[in-house]
């Protein structure tokens, strides 16, 4: 009886001695820590034997035109430069602007830091290796490169989850946010995010999976190709706890946010217009717009990582033999491009960020088309913030004196946004009747200018991306 045929080469590639990776490149990669991984990789190649077998890797470098390396290298270079400059701008602007320097926005700064480091550590190495059409930095360099990509990618995903949770609590459970917005607690959240990312990125150094070359052998990642229980267990848990579970949390948060806003709008329909209700509606609009900005960033991040995740899941399912070098390298570049979305989205849709750029980076503000009349966010923030605090001292009279003093002191210390402070009062009102709409937000919001169109009708909740008033 004939024995079953062995695995075949990926489509479009020839199999034979050229299926082996460069002996020079991998001669330093024979450490004992990779014995199990290398042994499994050998089983995929029926022609590998002897010294060549120890150097074999899952993706060949033959039959790949030079221009493929150069194109990928050029793209990753542009992505890296854009990511570094854009995220540096976000970090600088958020740190310089008083109106943006809030504990909640520390999550955005953390996202910008992780995206900047992703561009800084990944793009130059990928670009240099693409120019030479091979990996240049040895086994240690490969492990460090892949480790940085893993920890920074996980940090970004968990930070986006924390941003979604923050928006969820502010809009749907405002009373729960009293005292939770301090700088110390935010710092603990950020520390937890980085420790969580490290916990999932370190196991390959201790024998649970491994960091190996991938695609065109000009970049590295965790080993998702080897079909062993150990490697597959790591891949499965990694996807569950750093991708699918955070994604489910984000979906839950935004469904809850949308339902809360819709129910608030319905509760306020049919009642006579009042200045308090207009202020409530404007603040609800502003908070919803900020939530939409975060949602856009999250969606772009997930879409960027979706192709790469699909490739890894195909290999996890046991179909790694259908993967070609292009099917691994191109999704890897798309995933690394997730680092450029954050600054672009904020430059287009975040009104306070645009105004802060015009103030602190006037040349960039001109490019964004921001009017010079909006170049003083700090001054308006101080005025509005003082008004909010003074008004809350009377409007929050339903809270006992010690707790009220604690709440106001906490807000003054950590710099709550107007909407977050307003939400505390709004959530404490009855859930039905005219009082739920007419008395929800009698704190110190600057009175909105009246207009003939506004006197007899409650403004509808704007779901567009126009600037908040």
Swiss-Prot record:
One of its GO terms (cellular component) is dendrite. It is a multi-pass membrane protein. Keywords: Biological rhythms, Cell membrane, Cell projection, Chromophore, Disulfide bond, G-protein coupled receptor, Glycoprotein, Membrane, Photoreceptor protein, Receptor, Retinal protein, Sensory transduction, Transducer, Transmembrane, Transmembrane helix. Pfam families: 7tm_1 (PF00001). Its main location: membrane. It is found in: Cell membrane; Cell projection, Axon; Cell projection, Dendrite; Perikaryon. The keyword Transmembrane helix applies. Residues 93-106, 165-187, 259-295, 350-469 are cytoplasmic. Disulfide bonds join 142-220. Photoreceptor that binds cis-retinaldehydes. Contributes to pupillar reflex, photoentrainment and other non-image forming responses to light. May be involved in the optokinetic visual tracking response. May be involved in the regulation of retinal hyaloid vessel growth and regression. This is Melanopsin. It comes from Phodopus sungorus. The lineage of its organism: Eukaryota, Metazoa, Chordata, Craniata, Vertebrata. The gene is OPN4.
